[in-house]
């Protein structure tokens, strides 16, 4: 069971430096760095890592769709054996800040972030696993899958039914609705959890 992030001195150094750099260079992003560090953000990413371990899926090369700063998820994925995490973002600040959180992995080639709207542009490389833990913020994943029919991989999708936020444009009421939106028929795992916040 995956119950925590291994908080090593390297992680501490990168995350401390990120906080200092955001304060100095990206003060307008400070609130977002707090939002990405909530207990519910960690819970949802721990859940992903735990289920991936239980399913024994091949997951050497992972694409994150809208992975934001990828602070928790990258640490967890590398910890369970992923060789490469490639985050696809549309926000240049998110890319730059994600490189700060994940400097140790960027430097050794295990983390990349590209500015690319993957809902309108095809993927140019293969991945074993595609993770979208923020489906509520974008078009249904069926659009992505139709754009990339040759991509033969597993999908991990998370969403919410919390419609109170302006940027939640695509909430779902159930796991079944999420799978239906993505046109995924062969579901290896389905579940839901109540997050702290």
Model-derived segments and spans:
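Conserved SAM-binding loop of SAM-dependent methyltransferases across substrates and taxa
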Residues: 69-82
């Amino acid at each position: 069971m995956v119950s925590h992030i291994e908080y090593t001195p390297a992680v501490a150094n990168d995350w401390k430096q990120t906080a200092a750099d955001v304060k100095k260079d990206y003060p307008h992003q400070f609130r977002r760095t707090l939002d990405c560090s909530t207990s519910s953000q960690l819970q949802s990413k721990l859940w992903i890592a735990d289920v991936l371990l239980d399913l024994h899926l091949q997951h050497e090369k992972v694409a994150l769709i809208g992975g934001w700063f990828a602070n928790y998820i990258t640490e967890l994925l590398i910890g369970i054996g992923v060789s490469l995490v490639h985050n696809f973002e549309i926000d240049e600040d998110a890319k730059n800040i994600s490189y700060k959180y994940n400097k140790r992995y960027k430097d050794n080639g295990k983390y990349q972030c590209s500015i690319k709207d993957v809902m309108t542009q095809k993927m140019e490389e293969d991945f074993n696993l595609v993770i979208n833990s923020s489906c509520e913020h974008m078009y249904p994943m069926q659009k992505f899958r139709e754009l990339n029919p040759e991509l033969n991989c597993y999908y991990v999708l998370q969403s919410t039914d919390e419609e109170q936020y302006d940027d939640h444009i695509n909430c779902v009421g159930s796991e079944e609705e999420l799978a239906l939106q993505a046109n995924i028929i062969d579901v290896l795992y389905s579940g839901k959890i109540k997050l702290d916040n």
